[in-house]
């Protein structure tokens, strides 16, 4: 998946990420750009407009929770399937989330990182993070196979 150099680069960069801010924005953008994903968050209240979604405290809180789990995965890049096994089971068996949504969220996360970090988020880092989010999406979809 990742070389030792790529792991070092993404891990060092991830230390700069404010998961509360980035997580809320990434989940919010997912819900706005792919509105069918909102069906999993009906209990979150008003998701009727982009502003409502982006300012919804439950979206922000869940986005932080998602990125807290992602942060845990960043500590276990060599065992993403093991790290995300319980979440894969939850999302497959209980929540019935389409595993394609994990890929969508990963791609949105990369866009949000680029927005927050600008030129510091180099093309090389972007490529490395694309590998990470693909690995996480694959690990989360593992239970579906």
From Swiss-Prot:
GO CC terms in record: blood microparticle; haptoglobin-hemoglobin complex; hemoglobin complex
Keyword Membrane: no
Organs and tissues of expression: Red blood cells.
Stored PROSITE patterns: GLOBIN
A family per Pfam: Globin
Binding site for heme b: 62, 91
Gene Ontology process terms (BP): hydrogen peroxide catabolic process
Protein name listed in UniProt: Hemoglobin subunit beta
The species this protein was found in: Bubalus bubalis (Domestic water buffalo)
Gene: HBB
């Amino acid at each position: 998946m990742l070389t030792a150099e790529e792991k070092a680069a993404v891990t060092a960069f991830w230390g700069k990420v404010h998961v509360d801010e980035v997580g809320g924005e990434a989940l919010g953008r997912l819900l706005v750009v792919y509105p069918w994903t909102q069906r999993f968050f009906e209990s979150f209240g008003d998701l009727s407009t982009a502003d409502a979604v982006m300012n919804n405290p439950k979206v922000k809180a869940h986005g932080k929770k998602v990125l807290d789990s992602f942060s845990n995965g960043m500590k276990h890049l060599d065992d993403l399937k093991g790290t995300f096994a319980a979440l894969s089971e939850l999302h497959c068996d209980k929540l019935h989330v389409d595993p394609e949504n994990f890929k969508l969220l990963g791609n949105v996360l990369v866009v949000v990182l680029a927005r927050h970090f600008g030129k510091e988020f180099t093309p090389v880092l972007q490529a490395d993070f694309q590998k990470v989010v693909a690995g996480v999406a694959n690990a989360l979809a593992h239970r579906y196979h």
